[in-house]
């Protein structure tokens, strides 16, 4: 592809190390009959290797200047399907080829760091259609996604993603592997939506609302942050000390809190 002028507003940092690219493809382990979706292909570091393997690759790209080069390079390949759109607004359910009960989409991407959290929350809405996701993200974000209770990195993002997905930290990638090099380390994470969640909230919207409120002021206790949601007695009924901070509360306890809040509200 012709040299591209990287755009800061799209958070563009493109992979340039073939060894890392091969490691990512090996981690994804795509099979010929699978349906992959790539978000933000950039200069097609992953696109080419994936198209060599899979029967269908949907590409989501927002940058006008990349549409022409991508089309020119890959449009001859029947597996290549380009969507010139914003990944944050895209309806991923429209990619399904038929009504199916089996999650079929495998989503990959070197996600723009400036929109990674909102994009992950958007993708969680489509978890029932997704087999797995492999993303390059800012290392700090991957640490937050995979963090366990009691660790500083554990927060709202940890809870919301771990409620829906198994998470796995795969690989750290240094700035020197990108053009232009970012100011921070990156990492690759695997997210695999649960076929059946180990802990199920009665109402997912109430769960999301309560988790957001619990982490609204990280240095404050559950008692303070959940004022107006639950009282001390209700928090204790979930096996929790009202004086603990949200960062010490496991996902399953947030489900209990959410279910109690939902019933009390009703």
Curated annotation (Swiss-Prot):
Keyword vocabulary terms for this entry: Cytoplasm, Methyltransferase, RNA-binding, rRNA processing, S-adenosyl-L-methionine, Transferase
The UniProt record lists the keyword Transmembrane helix: no
Localisation: Cytoplasm
Residues noted as binding S-adenosyl-L-methionine in the record, renumbered to the chain: 13, 15, 40, 61, 86, 110
Catalytic activity: adenosine(1518)/adenosine(1519) in 16S rRNA + 4 S-adenosyl-L-methionine = N(6)-dimethyladenosine(1518)/N(6)-dimethyladenosine(1519) in 16S rRNA + 4 S-adenosyl-L-homocysteine + 4 H(+)
Entry GO terms, CC: cytosol
Keyword rRNA processing attached: yes
Pfam families: RrnaAD (PF00398)
E.C. number: 2.1.1.182
GO molecular function, a single term: RNA binding
Domain of life: Bacteria
InterPro entries the record matches: KsgA/Erm, rRNA_Ade_diMease-like_C, rRNA_Ade_methylase_Trfase_N, rRNA_adenine_dimethylase, SAM-dependent_MTases_sf
Chain's role: Specifically dimethylates two adjacent adenosines (A1518 and A1519) in the loop of a conserved hairpin near the 3'-end of 16S rRNA in the 30S particle. May play a critical role in biogenesis of 30S subunits.
Homology family: Belongs to the class I-like SAM-binding methyltransferase superfamily. rRNA adenine N(6)-methyltransferase family. RsmA subfamily.
Protein name: Ribosomal RNA small subunit methyltransferase A
Organism for this UniProt entry: Hydrogenovibrio crunogenus (strain DSM 25203 / XCL-2) (Thiomicrospira crunogena)
């Amino acid at each position: 592809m012709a040299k591209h002028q990287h755009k800061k507003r799209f958070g563009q940092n493109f992979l340039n190390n073939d060894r890392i690219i091969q490691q990512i493809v090996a981690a994804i382990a795509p099979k010929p009959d699978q349906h992959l979706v790539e978000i933000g292909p950039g200069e097609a570091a992953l696109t080419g290797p994936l198209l060599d393997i899979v029967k269908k690759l949907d590409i989501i790209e927002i940058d006008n200047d990349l549409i022409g080069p991508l089309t020119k390079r890959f449009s001859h390949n029947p597996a290549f399907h380009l969507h010139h759109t914003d990944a944050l607004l895209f309806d991923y359910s429209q990619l399904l080829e038929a009504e199916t009960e089996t999650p079929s989409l495998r989503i990959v991407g070197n996600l723009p760091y400036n929109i990674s959290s909102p994009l992950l929350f958007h993708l969680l809405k489509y978890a029932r259609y997704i087999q797995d996701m492999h993303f390059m993200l800012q290392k700090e974000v991957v640490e937050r996604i995979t963090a366990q209770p009691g660790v500083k990195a554990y927060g709202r993002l940890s809870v919301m993603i771990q409620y829906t997905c198994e998470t796995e930290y795969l690989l750290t990638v240094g700035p020197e592997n990108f053009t232009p090099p970012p100011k921070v380390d990156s990492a690759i994470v695997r997210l695999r939506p649960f076929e059946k969640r180990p802990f199920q909230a009665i109402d997912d919207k109430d769960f999301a609302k309560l988790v957001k409120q619990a982490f609204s002021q990280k240095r404050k206790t559950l008692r303070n942050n959940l004022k107006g949601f639950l009282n001390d007695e209700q928090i204790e009924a979930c096996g929790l000390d009202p004086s603990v901070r949200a960062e010490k509360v496991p996902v399953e306890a947030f489900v209990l809190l959410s279910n109690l809040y939902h019933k009390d509200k009703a």
